[in-house]
């Protein structure tokens, strides 16, 4: 809520990009929503960041990523993915974080 309150106090254009797990669409239990939202950040598939006064800052940078396959396999929406798909997702994650680390460290 602090980020929403901070944005509300700004007298300018604001944009908040939120990840909100959907139990029905994602094939997870309702009680797992918060854990899944944290897990997507921990495995590096979603990053927490702010862009303020012309500067981009990563708010949370995991020292080591947790297992992407564990995150993916717990969700029904990804049941069709095989190991090669998961490896492609990991490669995309690594490329994204290499870019972030190179340009926004």
Predicted regions and their residues:
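ATP/pyrophosphate-binding catalytic subdomain of soluble kinases
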Residues: 1-30
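Flexible, low-complexity linker and terminal segments
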Residues: 20-105
């Amino acid at each position: 809520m602090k980020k929403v309150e901070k944005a509300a106090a700004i007298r300018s254009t604001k944009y908040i990009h939120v990840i909100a797990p959907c139990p029905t669409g994602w094939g997870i239990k309702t009680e797992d929503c918060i854990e899944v939202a944290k897990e997507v950040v921990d495995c590096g598939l979603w990053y927490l960041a702010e862009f303020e006064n012309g500067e981009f800052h990563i708010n949370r940078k995991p020292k080591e990523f947790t297992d992407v396959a564990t995150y993916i396999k717990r969700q029904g929406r990804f049941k069709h993915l095989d190991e090669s798909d998961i490896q492609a997702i990991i490669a995309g994650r690594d490329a994204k974080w290499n870019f972030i680390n190179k340009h926004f460290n």
